[in-house]
């Protein structure tokens, strides 16, 4: 059986780079002991691991902070590509983390987010395009470059917590995914190829009217609202040279993208006054606003070899970058609880030397 790998761009990129690292140092010293909490991680307290095994990613809080929604792949558990799960967060140290699948088990899913009533989620799914996991592109046909697919069969759906799909929110040709909601739950940001490029759009959840809010050539995705709903933050590629533009357009025409060069952008919620706030090179990913208006994001910019990925904080203008996580593989997808007291993220830490990515929650301290 052909092994399927996760098609979450930054997670898959990390796996590729770590596999290369493991191969090149196979004759080197033994791997260091697993670590749940590194001494340098001064902002984390009472860190707890919620999942154990598989690839668990994009874990995001409900508005009442009682549950999280996330996507999960686990070959050993018969989950060959990402499906969506909801779990109740433990209230005491001895309470286990329990979760259940709420996507259909058909196709591939991605990027789930709770609605304001805490009774529904929105997520992207390819299930209308077929029951099987859509195929992974053969990188050898593209010079072994790191690429990932933009499945045209992705649309965004709303489901209740029993998995019943209540509404299809997008129904246009091409990719529609990467949805997040505003703090008041009235607006939905998402990425779409409906106008020929990978751009950001905003949907009014009541009228379902959609407005395009980015227009520059390049991949715009992973967008979030600020805590007051007035700003948005996202990561974007901006091909500039003739060769870069040619490569980007050729890959996009085949439903592919090479997400290895991304920077963090901010704008007003309507897309106006857009500004690039990082100039770091490599992959700067998963940006989100902190409770005090600063920014937290994931990056591999410190490492020429492309890994590890760690989390950093910075001011909203890109100044004062501070490294806050220290795993030797992968730390990403940070989100603060609505009350700002806790942080949830995904990491390769404490995985017994495997490539598993798990979910962690911690108290946040300054």
Where are the predicted features?
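Bacterial Sec-dependent N-terminal signal peptides
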Residues: 1-28
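Hydrophobic beta-strand positions that form the internal "hydrophobic ladder"
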Residues: 68, 121, 188, 232, ...
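A flexible loop/linker signature enriched in serine peptidases of the S9 family
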Residues: 52-55, 71-84, 104-109, 124-155, ...
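Beta-strand-rich domains and repeat architectures in extracellular enzymes and scaffolds
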Residues: 35-37, 46-79
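Residue-level detector of Asp-centered blade-edge/turn motifs that repeat once per structural unit
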Residues: 63-64, 116-117, 183-184, 227-228, ...
């Amino acid at each position: 059986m052909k092994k399927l790998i996760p098609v979450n761009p930054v997670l898959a990129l990390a796996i590729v780079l770590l596999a290369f690292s493991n191969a090149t140092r196979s004759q080197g010293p033994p791997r260091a002991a697993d670590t749940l909490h590194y001494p340098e991680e001064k902002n984390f307290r009472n860190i707890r691991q919620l999942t154990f095994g598989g690839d668990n990613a994009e874990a995001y809080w409900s508005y009442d902070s009682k549950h999280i929604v996330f996507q999960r792949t686990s070959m050993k558990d018969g989950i060959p590509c990402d499906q969506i799960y909801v779990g109740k967060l433990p209230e005491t140290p001895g309470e286990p983390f329990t979760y259940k699948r709420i996507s259909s088990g058909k196709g591939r899913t991605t990027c789930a987010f709770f609605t304001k009533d805490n009774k529904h989620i929105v997520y992207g799914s390819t299930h209308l395009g077929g029951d099987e996991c859509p195929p992974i592109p053969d990188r050898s046909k593209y010079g072994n470059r790191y690429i990932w697919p933009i499945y045209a069969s992705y649309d965004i759906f709303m489901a209740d917590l029993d998995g019943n799909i209540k509404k299809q929110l997008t129904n246009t040709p091409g990719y529609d995914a990467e949805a997040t909601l505003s703090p008041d739950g009235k607006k939905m940001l998402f990425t779409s190829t409906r106008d020929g490029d990978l751009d950001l759009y905003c949907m009014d959840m009541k009228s379902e009217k959609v407005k395009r809010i980015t227009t520059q050539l390049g991949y715009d995705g992973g967008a979030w609202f600020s805590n007051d709903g007035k700003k948005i933050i996202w990561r974007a590629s901006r091909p500039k040279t003739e060769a870069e533009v040619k490569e980007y357009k050729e890959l996009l025409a085949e439903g592919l993208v090479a997400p290895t060069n991304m920077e963090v952008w901010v704008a007003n919620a309507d897309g106006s006054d857009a500004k690039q706030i990082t100039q770091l090179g490599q992959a700067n990913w998963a940006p989100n606003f902190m409770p005090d208006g600063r920014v937290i994001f994931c990056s591999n910019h410190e490492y020429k070899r492309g890994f590890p990925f760690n989390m950093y904080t910075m001011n909203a203008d890109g100044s004062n970058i501070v490294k806050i996580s220290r795993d030797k593989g992968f730390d990403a997808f940070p989100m603060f609880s609505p009350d700002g007291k806790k942080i949830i993220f995904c990491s390769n830490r404490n995985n017994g030397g495997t490539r598993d990515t798990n979910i962690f929650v911690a108290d946040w301290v300054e």
